[in-house]
């Protein structure tokens, strides 16, 4: 999947920088029905997600405040290409594909400066916008599904009453 995405991105003008592997440690499904301890049709599970880092012009960011809020320990740990932490509950968030706040928090602090704008073109439950605003960035999110826009707005208002979101 990552190679396919990178190939398509390059064809439309993006440049590849790197890949981060998120090792989602708490995945519960370990076998598919009918394949338990049988060579007939075992299901191999890979509890990882790829975060493909792409850019358009120059990799080095030259605009913005250049005000960092990442600590030395965060930088050293997060520039390692494998991140391991648990996923998020679908039931708790109310979205079929949630991810924990830690995931966008790391990406936001590693790849943007304080005051930058963070765009999430797949808003979903609002996790990325929530973390952008919580980390002194401007969070902008869009989604084709109005119910997820409403879910994101409600979640952001509930989890951080100081944030404003216009839908």
For each feature predicted by the language model, list its residue ranges.
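S-adenosyl-L-methionine
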Residues: 153-167
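Core catalytic lobe of class I
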Residues: 1-151
């Amino acid at each position: 999947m990552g190679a396919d995405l990178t190939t398509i991105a390059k064809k439309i003008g993006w440049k590849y920088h790197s890949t981060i592997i998120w090792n989602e440690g708490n995945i519960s499904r370990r076998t598919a029905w009918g394949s338990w301890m049988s060579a007939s049709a075992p299901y191999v599970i890979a509890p990882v997600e790829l975060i493909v880092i792409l850019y358009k012009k120059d990799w080095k960011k030259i605009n913005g405040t250049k005000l960092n809020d990442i600590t030395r320990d965060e930088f050293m740990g997060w520039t390692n290409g494998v991140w391991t932490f648990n996923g998020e509950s679908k039931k708790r968030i109310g979205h079929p594909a949630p991810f924990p706040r830690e995931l966008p928090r790391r990406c936001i602090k590693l790849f943007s400066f304080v005051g930058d704008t963070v765009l999430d073109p797949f808003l979903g439950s609002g996790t990325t916008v929530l973390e952008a605003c919580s980390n002194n960035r401007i969070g902008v999110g869009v989604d084709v599904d109005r119910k997820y826009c409403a879910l994101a707005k409600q979640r952001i208002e509930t989890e951080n009453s100081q944030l404003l979101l216009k839908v």
